[in-house]
Amino acid sequence: PAGYTAAEKAAAGGLSTVLFEKNALGGVCLNEGCVPTKTLLYSAKVYDTIKHAPKYAVSAENPAFDFPKIIARKNKVVKKLTAGIRMKMKENGVEVVGGEAEIKGRAADGTISIASGEAVYEAANLLICTGSETVIPPIPGLSETEYWTSREALLSKELPASLVIIGGGVIGMEFASFFNSMGTVSYTHLRAHETLR
């Protein structure tokens, strides 16, 4: 979340600040990474706890989950946090511009021209925080299949019967844990010899 955090600090320090964002505020972490996966994991944890309730002398017959409602809850959490960031930007006087920004050049006095849509902005300083992109491994035949990235996994409306997760990083392991708890037969394929390197 470097972009909006830096914008907030700059504005709090008295700088006139503009934040350009073509997607939802909060970046990958809030919208497609750690926050939504942790929300899904919490639902899985509650479900697992209820399934094992008799072990703790607690009666909980026929535990069940509603997958679309789990996804809806995740979306609600993300939306609430995104709205919170937007409110913080407004409170701190950060102008949020939705859309792409293009650096047009630098004047002789060092001022940087930045265009977004029809508007042009002038700035003394520029911080570029482009976030991250999903890396698609060069696996033969992968491009001919309907594979998921973490983005599609978070948007899924139906629980898959089985799933192969390529990657042993945090997000991959969180998805493996979540889908396994929900009853999906989950396999992980690691490039390295250990998970969570």
Q: What would you call each of these model-derived segments?
A:
Residues 1-18, 175-180:
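N-terminal Rossmann-like FAD-binding beta1-loop-alpha1 element of flavoenzymes
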Residues 158-187:
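Rossmann-like NAD(P)H-binding beta-loop-alpha module
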Residues 188-195:
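Conserved small/polar residues in nucleotide/adenosyl-binding loops
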